[in-house]
């Protein structure tokens, strides 16, 4: 019964886990991070906001529409992640937009841990699923190795 109870949540975890493993390889999942050579980080936060407001897909009116800024000085960029899941990559020296793309990896991560369905699903469905799968795996390993170990002990 354990396998039957966890089959759907486990399938979701497997599929989304595979997608998350590929997020750096497949640009459809997560936009590739651009790199630029820079001498100085010369743009200000106010510049980042005004540049981001010019990207219509991101629907940014003010700071409240921005989920986070991911500053990468070693790559010379800042990633602006809008609350509507659009990502804007901006050159930190010249302030030019290097890339805009929809970021699906966040939704896939929420599906993977169950929080997309409901905040409680993470702890009340997906955590027990993981525990049941661990128990099933341990019992499967036990059933696999016990006959092998029994044969070895009979031979000696």
Across the structure, where does each feature detected by a protein language model lie?
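Conserved histidines in hydrophobic membrane contexts and catalytic metal-binding motifs
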Residues: 1-156
């Amino acid at each position: 019964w354990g396998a039957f109870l966890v089959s759907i949540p486990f399938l979701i975890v497997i599929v989304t886990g595979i997608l998350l493993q590929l997020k750096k390889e497949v640009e459809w999942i997560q936009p590739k991070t651009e790199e630029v050579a820079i001498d100085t980080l010369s743009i200000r936060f106010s510049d980042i906001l005004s540049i981001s407001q010019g990207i219509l897909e991101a629907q940014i009116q003010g700071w409240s529409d921005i989920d986070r800024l991911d500053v990468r000085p070693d790559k010379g960029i800042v990633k602006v992640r809008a609350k509507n899941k659009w990502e804007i990559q901006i050159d930190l020296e010249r302030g030019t937009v290097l890339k805009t793309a929809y970021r699906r990896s966040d939704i896939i991560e929420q599906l993977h841990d169950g929080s997309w369905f409901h905040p409680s699903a993470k702890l009340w469905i997906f955590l027990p699923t993981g525990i049941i799968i661990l128990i099933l795996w341990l019992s499967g390993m036990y059933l696999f190795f016990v006959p092998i170990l029994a044969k070895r002990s009979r031979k000696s």
